[in-house]
Amino acid sequence: MEYNPKAIEKKWQEHWKNKRTHEPLSDTSLPKKYILSMFPYPSGRIHMGHVRNYCIGDAIARHFRKQNFNVLHPIGWDAFGMPAENAAIKHKSHPKKWTYDNISNMREELDSLGLSFSNEREFATCDPIYSKWEQKFFIDMWNRGLIYRKKGFLNWCPNDQTVLANEQVIEGRCWRCDTEVVQKEMFQYYVKITDYAEELLGSLDTLEGRWPSQVLTMQRNWIGRSEGLSFAFKLTSSSKERIGGSFDSFEVFTTRPDTLYGVTYCALAPEHPLVRELMRQGKLPQESLEALAKMQNIPAKERAMIPKEGVALGLEAIHPLTGEAIPLWAANFVLTDYGSGAVMAVPAHDERDFEFAKKYQLPQKQVILSGAAPSLDEAAYTESGTLINSGIFDGLESESAKEKIIRYFEEHSLGRGVINYRLRDWGISRQRYWGTPIPLIHCPSCGIVPEDFSNLPITLPEDVIIDGEGNPLEKHPAWKECRCPKCGGKATRETDTMDTFVESSWYFLRYTTPKEEWETHALNEAMQRYWMGVDEYIGGIEHAILHLLYARFFTKVLRDLGYTETNEPFTHLLTQGMVLKDGAKMSKSKGNVVDPDELIERFGADTARLFVLFAAPPTRELEWNDSAVEGAYRFIKRLCDKTQFVQKVSSLPQIETATLSKTEKLARKKVHETLLKAQEVYSRKNAYAFNTLIASCMEALNALSDQENPAIFTEGYFILLSVLEPIIPHVAWELSQEYFGLANFKPLTPDTQALKSDSLTIAITVNGKKRGEIEMAPGSSNEAMLEAAKNEVSKWLEGMSIIKEIVVPDKLVNLVVKP
């Protein structure tokens, strides 16, 4: 058959759509597979990373459909977010139009790959019906006390009068106008993800062996559970007087109470309330005030990369055990949103504290015996050891001292042992237009009130001006002004919108609900119970922390709110590698982008699919290779050229093996080994190593071509098309329909007789070194194996005495000799 990809691919894409071939069934008695690739942002064009991600998921989905599983394999669009607003400013287009136009373009591109998505479950997160239920979840969480409002510091561009995301701050300046960014305190909405910290951490254990260990480690570190001591440093009388009595003490947390006697100063975040009060009162020199203001305007993520700096505050605190006066400093390495925003500094036993103390000539005090460690003049000793200079705790080992010091603090009401987490509550409000409106009303009489469910969804006004200056919703009085749902009085809407990570934290649950129920149900209880969890979730490892953690958290919240019974949303996680060209990630700036549309136009979708699945294992980086693409095309063409040897049949041919030649048996063996490998690949035994499966298919086609028995060729072709269907579906369906009436797209079982060999290769070693090989019939006796082996390696036995003979049946002969 002549290979014409354009005609074949268009034909079968229309067939699958018209026949609803890829839609999930409502029959919950069937075994199910939920295969999901992370949904894309509708940027306008797909890239090769998309192609790889979706071809991996599609191959898995197609395989399990062929195995008679009920498969849910949906697609949707993560459609809210900042790029749409940026495009509106740049191109003078509305974010809504820009977004939906991009969705239309990208869906056409994805369709051209022959991806077997469910068309009837597709949605965009900017669809009002999706926002309706997200707003309902927000209200439920607000009423449950899981969402609260407080002031927080945000990146603020004074020129554009707008909040900037961290990624919009480039070296401390606004990405758009190059104005220096400042930190501005504003009200924000936070979700209490910390209420679930222990469960989020503990249930990672249930994902061992099913998620990549690297992702599990990253989440454990991000949650950051630590046990330690929480206590207060009280200010000295003179310090309290200096600050006008507005502060009496400040809290700290330490995981090293065994070093407490080594505290020589305390460091506070530049944004700490005590520091801000000092600044407000003007109790610091102008130089110090300017230095603090500069520190406060550096985003937290950039502080870790700059030299450590501090400002002496002219205040002192009382050491709770020694009574000594400890100086207070503001330091740029202390973050206000981690712990209490204040730390006890032990320069002798903490590297960061040591570096800061060296810079500002602050004292250090050794309280842990360092043994053979370097001099404390050169570096801090950070390991455990025996306590010294620690009063009544001298001589204790660190672990014992930690317990006793915590107990001492608790017995004397000085502090308490606590479990702390690095994880912070999730700030979900954004001062932007293109996002899900937060469903809260500000009433002068009633305070902050959730909107009535009957008024949901709160939709965005379309008559807005997006110019990059301020929040368009804040400047839209007709939309902003409303009635309080509680008292009916005049009120105003909340103008913040939700972080787009909220949308992607539950979309996988939404897919389980049939489209006809989207208006009336957030989730269909029976359907989500049947489909969840996602059997295979596919996406980049860059989502290991935020998206995957938020999705796990949101699932647990919805469980507690009664929407689902699922504890963990993703049963298995596959993190695919990046697509590289010339050793670097593809990007327009590097000029190394490969356009998927051009690739499909030239070679066809099946070639693109075959290449991305063959060039590297899914979890590894894929290096682009033009000649390998051409090789993939040649293989498909060769597959089509071989149809002259195929007989038309409606079932798997029965082969009489007794009369087969060695070449014919070898061809059958290779084909059935390929079928066996397919079973292993899709069972996750080797992380979906499609590359090895495709290589086996190529070898099998070669073996079939080396023999002339049409029955053998037909059987092999019948099986190979079935194995290749998830990978190159268009040509597989075309050939299968022509010769087998699609009868081979069903579960096939390897023939155990075909897998057997007439002979086995036996390795021969002499004194442990391989010296030769022999061919033996399976099940040959030890005596026969020894005789053949000795003949094969006779030259290595000359002048030697055999002192030991070791035979491993069907595998090995080892001869131990000496002169």
From Swiss-Prot:
PANTHER family, A to Z: LEUCINE--TRNA LIGASE, MITOCHONDRIAL, LEUCYL-TRNA SYNTHETASE
Top-level lineage group: Bacteria
Family note: Belongs to the class-I aminoacyl-tRNA synthetase family.
EC identifiers of the protein: 6.1.1.4
Gene3D superfamilies: 3.10.20.590, HUPs, Isoleucyl-tRNA Synthetase, Domain 1
Name of this protein: Leucine--tRNA ligase
Chain positions recorded as ATP binding sites: K588
InterPro entries for the chain: aa-tRNA-synth_I_CS (IPR001412), Leu-tRNA-ligase (IPR002302), Leu_tRNA-synth_edit (IPR025709), Methionyl/Leucyl_tRNA_Synth (IPR015413), Rossmann-like_a/b/a_fold (IPR014729), tRNAsynth_Ia_anticodon-bd (IPR009080), Val/Leu/Ile-tRNA-synth_edit (IPR009008)
Subcellular location, record wording: Cytoplasm
Main location: cytoplasm
Keyword Aminoacyl-tRNA synthetase: yes
Catalyses which reaction(s): tRNA(Leu) + L-leucine + ATP = L-leucyl-tRNA(Leu) + AMP + diphosphate
Sequence motif 'KMSKS' region, residues: 585-589
Organism: Wolinella succinogenes (strain ATCC 29543 / DSM 1740 / CCUG 13145 / JCM 31913 / LMG 7466 / NCTC 11488 / FDC 602W)
Any one of the GO BP annotations: leucyl-tRNA aminoacylation
GO molecular function: aminoacyl-tRNA deacylase activity; ATP binding; leucine-tRNA ligase activity
Motif segment ('HIGH' region): 40-50
Keyword Ligase: yes
Pfam families found in the cross-reference section: tRNA-synt_1_2, tRNA-synt_1g
GO CC terms in record: cytosol
